[in-house]
Amino acid sequence: MLSIVVRAQADKVMVTYKDDGIRLTVNGKDFVVNGMNWDYFPIGTNYSYSLWNDSDETIRQALDTEMGLLKNMGVNTIRVYTGIPPKWIEYIYRTHGIYTMLNHSFGRYGLTIAGAWAPNTEYADPRVRDLLLKEVQTLVAEYRNTPGLLLYLLGNENNYGLFWEGAETENIPMADRKSTQRARAMYKLFNEAAVLMKTADNTHPVALCNGDLLFLDLIAQECKDVDIFGTNVYRGVSFGDLFDRVKKEYGKPVLFTEFGADAFNVISNEEDQTAQAHFLKGNWREIYENAAGLGKSGNSIGGFTFQFSDGWWKYGQTLNLDVHDANASWSNGGYTNDFKQGENNMNEEWFGICAKGPTNAQGLYQLYPRAAYYVLKDAHQLNPYAPGTTLAGIQRFFEGVSIPDAALRARGDRAASAGEKGKILRLSRFGAAFTSFNTGGSLITTPKDPDPNNPVFPNQLGFDHMQSLFVGVEANPSPNMRANIELNVLGNVAQNPIDQIFYENRGRPVQLVGP
């Protein structure tokens, strides 16, 4: 009997330096990251939900729907946090041809140290160091041979976490440099983790995720062994001097781990698909223009648009999870379409390039592409590494990417989304509750049968039942106004519950005795 074991073969991904710039290569071929920040959160859930806890059939249906849409628009890589099983990374790759950048948060949202939860990670703490290094070593051991794995990403703008007290996005205190000492300890640990990971796996690069360029000087000093400078950047339609600064001050390739625009206008107080598409078009144009071989900075290897679908849980995190909140939680002058000095204009729950539909009985939902989806579908047809590509050619290409045309294509999706949600008025609840009560015992004063001349409660031994009908109507005339009314129609009200105070007892029949 002959037994043959075939091992899954992972791709060899490398960062290559040439005179004309820096490239990411996969099995020797140039690879530009047309990426998307992807997650799966049905309306009504938050960060505590995980798709990977569902059945394989449910996961497969969710992935096939979402990855099909992503592949259709030209996405070749998704950014996913740890927790996704290796088999689904492989499934996404083999079924849909999409790679995964695996993201370890590296203490961004707190850690459990010695049995106690610490919301703000102190990277200089030896216990933190030991825990995080152990976690990334375990991560590499589990995923390094997974087909479809593109690279590892450490953190998520952890430098901002040195200022913020929680996970919710806030304004950034850029002038506050009191955290420099904490930041240095953090970046040293990033580098130490990268060394360990690359020692165990030399076929997948390691990137860090920074918030914009804050502490770039420390990164250049402390993170010499990190392969890729990943950065979350929200500057509006242009990244400004970012490419040149990273080239001069750090010398590593630039990978935008987050960037984008929300699809809500706080001035007009309504969805604004055109503005979102405008900002993303400008961002991707600069990403391609700064790729290697085109005469500019030559250090851009791609990016991950933020994000694929709206996160209805982002504002408040645990409250109003079934409400698409229009509250703006931070301000950014780069988004000139709705910026007012002193007022917030960034709406965390509206960053999706797809709107999200209601959840069905299986826990799945449909997506409805916005204009930005169609703009990116056109933009991702460009390959900056294709022979004959020039800066002038890229400029002509993007002049042909039409936002009005994309908005027209998205109108049908918007109408379908609004129709499914019942935009202005909808039935929010319709149900019935039937409850039985049994009262019994030998050492009690409750009568065996009800006595109309002695209306005591409980009024009898044995069984009785309750009937309630619930009807709810919700009005949503505008994104910042929502009203809901619920009616409880009582049928039969039980007379024998031992608890004498309960909501339904107001519906007990009252017997009036006349003269």
Language model: regions and residue ranges:
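Active-site mouth of glycoside hydrolases
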Residues: 25, 29-229, 239, 247-249
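Active-site clefts of carbohydrate-active enzymes
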Residues: 111-118, 162-172, 250-290, 300-301, ...
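Extracellular loop and loop/strand-boundary signature of outer-membrane beta-barrel proteins
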Residues: 124, 181-182, 450-460, 502-514
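Non-catalytic scaffold segments within catalytic domains of secreted glycoside hydrolases
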Residues: 134, 207-226, 231-240, 262-304, ...
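Transmembrane beta-barrel domains of outer membrane proteins
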Residues: 198, 472-474, 515
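Aromatic-rich peripheral "rim/lid" segments of glycoside hydrolase catalytic domains that contact
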Residues: 306-420
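Short glycine/proline- and aromatic-enriched beta-strand/turn motifs that initiate or cap beta-hairpins
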Residues: 410-477, 482, 486-490
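Gram-negative (and chloroplast) outer-membrane scaffold detector with strong preference
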Residues: 477-515
